[in-house]
Curated annotation (Swiss-Prot):
Residues 586-704 are annotated as: Spacer. Residues 385-832 are annotated as: Pocket. This is Retinoblastoma-related protein 2. It holds the Pfam family RB_B. One of its GO terms (cellular component) is nucleus. Residues 850-864 have a biased composition (Polar residues).
Length: 978
């Protein structure tokens, strides 16, 4: 491509613009942008195995979309739409979104200079990608459900018939698109879309001739709900698809109105109309439209829908009709067949974190007991798709949370009133303000920042419903946390915790995020809740584990979502500029304060509730009365407990640096970074101001506790990823050394993580250890294997922050690839640690080590010095995992008959017998080569769901599907629960 004349590229772009009918202004500006960024855009290594022609098409599509979108929003003109661009370039949506992120990073300066610093937010690429995912999931659900209810196209056609099944399925999809254009809530989330599609299916079941059904009404397994009058249609569909009957009835009413207006037909009560379609169906509450799909008029009705769809379905950047008719054009071949396909570079959380792919195809399959002759030997495994996952979690929200009161319970009020001053009104007011900021209903500019060509993106009923769900979930978890803290501290007065503004906001943000994740919204993706609440990623990382631990009914899919969020927070977001992690580090590690201050990394003060109200233009009407200021002063950073929610957080960002610049560093353990002590750290210490003394041990600041907890989670995440990557490379022998180097860097060279991604340090550690170990392992091999990891993002190894000093002595920054970073930054910083590995591997005294294991003992774990990960993989070649015994199973195992079991709480198998004899017997059994086990496993003791939930991926994902187990600090409770 580099050898081609420069004019050839511009000529092909001009030809494409003519073919698409792009106006001269957009075409000329696109050519100018391409000319400025051509060198970076057309660098072929970015595109991997793609041909130069495909790479060029992707560049053209990206430039055209950027110019058309940004010029439109700037000048108000209408440009070419994304679906037209991709169709003209013969590209799939997922290919475009996969490459757009890296292309955007390459011409960031070009677009920023032309369209302003907010150009990336105005492009709405992430929202569009999620909308594509939603519509593809919805269309697959609709096609699958339709094929279950109606005959296949090959068997339905009758002689003389002018209508066939493809026409009916197309009719239903187009009707859904019309309904969607009239119902704003269908725009926002997958759950609402499914309710709309189920309503369309119900209408088709009533109106499509019965001869096209794949079942008979009587005795059907599709419609199992019965009344005295016959099959109860809507409850049966709700049972099949986990929808809400109330919402489905509401959606049916909206569908009736759309049909009445569009087809100019009067809806009549189905009970008043006699037709074979309604035989044996309870018609109470159902409406019927005469001649809606009859042969004589059906084709004209379908043409009307197609004509309207051509104008309403393509108003935005996407051609919505295409998701049904050309789904193979939307998706790649490898993604189009699976019901849980991935789109673009964003992995689905619950698939990325699923358990071993070699033995279990999808850990979201409904758990079932092992097949046996007693149960017929065959069990139907229900595969969990994005739709079934969303509907299952929505059912949990509907059944468990929606029935709760929308105010503090009597027990929670007891905790709030037991504080130094009654905090009930403060809590209620805070919930109202923060949730209004997340789900705006009263603000003047409601919906203007959401985009995606939807002026009323947050319509009031939808936002009010989500606010109600989030507030109920918040009150429920807050009460559970209060109960646990009261029991652990043996006090009912929880003033330090319950008056902590940051703690409450984190809990509210987590509740709102789960509500958004449950409904699979496309207009408000993470980290939107952080921006709305004034929190940082480090703040939210403190609450996730406690949230999971104290909400016992949380579905597995939502636990996986929180697990994925925590990984994002740990790996990069908490290390970004403006993270409150740096405010804690300057207290816990004063030696880092100079560099933190020079880089400008400190977080801004958390905005007060008054500031949030002013920013959102929230009208005070409808909000609880403002609580009076009861506390004369507050701790720094808005965290100390003597603070009302109304306090303005005005402390300077640099005050922590100035205050602690002369403070001696805290005493550390011999190993440098100390993993958390066994003692219990209350939540108040985690959320307290960094400069406040720890209530458990007054000789250390609360910042030390927070940093220790955070670093312990970083180490666990790194241990899992190092193990997986070493196994992929077939160099398991490097695992411990790489982990130890990483651990030392985190402790001794923490600044190496600033503004960077954890995986960048892992990759450099792996290459550095391989070099000093004299292994022929190249960076290319490491990166190629890293690309196969589920968390891989190209920018991890292509764009790494490097600080630099300009000519005027000021500090600047630039981004380089991982090899440049390794040579210029990593090696000079870590060289002493790497050199220390060289003599240790060949030291003679190591070979004469007298502390070798006792002969006959089982081989020690190669990961014995890693933090306690649960479950732990003990074999690189087999899917074998070991996890501590759950507390819930302890009592059942401690029956008198179970005393003969080995290794049960370390007790001897016989009275007064030495434990060494038991250990010798265990070793003998483990090492006996011809040992046979004649007993059968009793699955009654531990359920399949527990076993399945404890498995981890052999070559990717978290080692535990439970974030409380995989990322919890090393406390007694977390070890037990893991």
């Amino acid at each position: 491509m580099a050898s081609q004349p420069p004019a050839a590229v511009e000529a092909r772009l001009a030809d494409l613009c003519k073919e698409l009918g792009v106006d001269e202004g957009v075409a000329g500006e696109a050519a100018a942008v391409l000319e400025e960024g051509k060198g970076a855009l057309l660098a072929s290594p970015s595109f991997g195995s793609k041909s130069p022609e495909d790479a060029e098409k992707l560049c053209f599509a990206f430039v055209l979309y950027c110019v058309s979108k940004l010029k439109e929003t700037k000048a108000g003109s209408s440009g070419v739409r994304l679906w037209e661009i991709l169709k003209g370039c013969k590209l799939k949506y997922d290919d475009f979104f996969k490459e757009s992120q890296r292309l955007a990073s390459r011409i960031d300066q070009v677009l920023g200079s032309r369209y302003g610093s907010d150009w990336e937010a105005r492009l709405e690429l992430k929202q569009l990608e999620n909308l594509v995912n939603l519509l593809a999931d919805a269309s697959r659900f609709y096609c699958k459900a339709f094929n279950e209810l109606f005959l296949s196209p090959s068997t339905d056609q009758e002689p003389g018939s002018t209508t066939n099944i493809p026409d009916y399925i197309r009719f239903g999809w187009l009707l859904f698109l019309i309904l969607r254009s009239k119902s704003p809530e269908l725009f926002k989330d997958l759950v609402s879309c499914i309710h709309g599609l189920v309503a369309i299916l119900a209408i088709l079941l009533i109106h499509v001739p019965a001869k096209f059904r794949s079942f008979t009404i009587e005795g059907s397994s599709h419609l199992i709900k019965q009344t005295e009058k016959g099959v109860d249609l809507l409850p049966s569909l709700c049972h099949n698809y986990h929808t809400s009957e109330d919402r489905l009835k509401e959606m049916m009413g909206k569908s009736y109105k759309v049909i009445e207006v569009f087809f100019s037909r009067k809806a009549i009560n189905a009970s008043e109309f006699k037709t074979v379609n309604l035989d044996k169906i309870d018609t109470d509450g159902l409406m019927y439209f005469k001649d809606l799909v009859d042969d004589e008029i059906f084709q004209s009705n379908l043409e009307k829908l197609e004509k309207l769809s051509s104008t309403t379905g393509c108003q935005g950047e996407l051609d919505l009709e295409m998701f049904l008719t050309s789904n193979d054009y939307v998706l790649n071949a490898e993604n189009s067949s699976g019901s849980s396909a991935n789109f673009g570079c964003s992995k689905r959380v619950f698939e990325t974190l699923a358990s071993p792919t070699k033995t279990i195809k999808n850990m979201l399959a409904a758990p079932s007991s092992p097949s046996s002759p007693a149960n017929g030997g065959s069990i139907k495994i229900v595969q969990m798709t994005p739709v079934t996952s969303a509907m299952t979690t929505a059912k949990w929200l509907r059944d468990v949370i929606s029935s709760l009161p929308d105010k503090p319970s009597s027990k929670l009020e007891e905790f709030l009133s037991s504080c130094d001053t009654d905090l009930t009104s403060d809590v209620v007011k805070r919930v109202s303000i923060i949730l209004e900021a997340i789900f705006p209903t009263k603000s003047i500019d409601r919906g203007t920042s959401i985009g995606l060509n939807c002026a009323n993106a947050f319509d009031i009923p939808w936002a009010e419903a989500r606010k109600m769900e989030a507030s109920k979930l918040y009150y429920r978890v807050l009460e559970a946390i209060c109960r646990a803290e009261s029991q652990n501290n043996n006090v009912n007065n929880l003033t330090p915790l319950l008056s902590n503004e940051r703690f409450h906001r984190c809990l509210i943000a987590c509740s709102a995020e789960l509500v958004l994740a449950t409904h699979k919204t496309v207009i408000m993706m993470f980290p939107a809740v952080l921006e709305s609440t004034g929190l940082t990623a480090f703040d939210l990382s403190k609450i996730i584990e406690n949230f999971v631990r104290h909400e016992e009914t949380l579905p597995r899919e939502l636990k996986r979502h929180l697990n994925s969020l925590e990984e994002q927070l740990l790996e990069s977001m908490s290390w970004e500029k403006g993270s409150s992690l740096y405010n804690s580090l300057v207290v816990a590690r004063p030696s880092l304060s100079t560099e933190i201050n020079s880089l400008g990394l400190l977080a801004e003060p958390m905005p007060s509730l008054d500031g949030i109200v002013a920013r959102q233009s929230i009208h005070p009407d409808g909000l609880p009365p403002t609580p009076s200021k009861r506390w004369p002063s507050a701790g720094p950073d808005g965290n100390c407990y003597p603070q009302s929610p109304k306090r303005l957080c005005t402390e300077s960002r640099n005050s922590l640096v100035e205050r602690n610049s002369q403070t001696p560093p805290p005493k550390q353990s011999q190993t440098g970074l100390s993993i958390l002590k066994a003692k219990y750290h209350p939540l108040q210490a985690t959320f307290a101001s960094p400069t406040v003394s720890n209530p458990v041990s007054g000789n250390e600041k609360c910042a030390v506790v927070g940093v220790q907890i955070f670093f312990s989670k970083i180490l666990k995440l790194a241990a899992i990823r190092i193990r997986n990557l070493c196994e992929r490379l077939r160099h398991e022998e490097l695992t411990v050394s790489v982990y130890n180097i990483f651990k030392q860097i985190l402790d001794q060279q923490t600044a190496l993580f600033f503004n960077r991604h954890v995986d960048q340090i892992i990759l450099c550690c792996l290459y550095g250890v391989a070099k000093v170990s004299q292994l022929s392992l190249t960076f290319k091999e490491i990166v190629n294997n890293y690309k196969r990891e589920p968390q891989c993002k190209p920018e991890v190894f292509r764009s790494i922050f490097v600080g630099s000093t300009n000519r005027n002595g000021g500090f600047g920054s630039r981004h380089v690839d991982i090899i440049v970073f390794y040579n210029q930054v990593f090696v000079p910083t870590v060289k002493p640690l790497l050199v220390a590995l060289m003599p240790s591997s060949t030291r003679p005294e190591d070979k004469r080590n007298t502390n070798s294991q006792i002969p006959g003992s089982p081989k020690s774990s190669p990961f014995s010095n890693l933090p306690d990960m649960s479950p732990k993989k003990v074999s690189s070649s087999h899917n074998v995992y070991v996890s501590p015994l759950r507390q819930t199973k302890m009592d059942a195992l401690l029956s008198p008959s179970s005393r003969s079991f080995y290794a049960c709480i370390g007790e001897s198998t016989q009275a007064f017998q030495s434990p060494s004899k038991d250990l010798a017997a265990i070793n003998s059994r483990l090492n006996y080569p011809t040992r046979r086990i004649n007993t059968r496993i009793n699955f009654d003791m531990v359920s399949d769901s527990v076993v399945a939930g404890s498995l981890g991926q052999p070559n990717g994902g978290s080692a535990s599907s439970d974030p409380a187990a995989a990322f919890s600090p090393l406390s007694k409770k977390s070890k037990t629960d893991s």
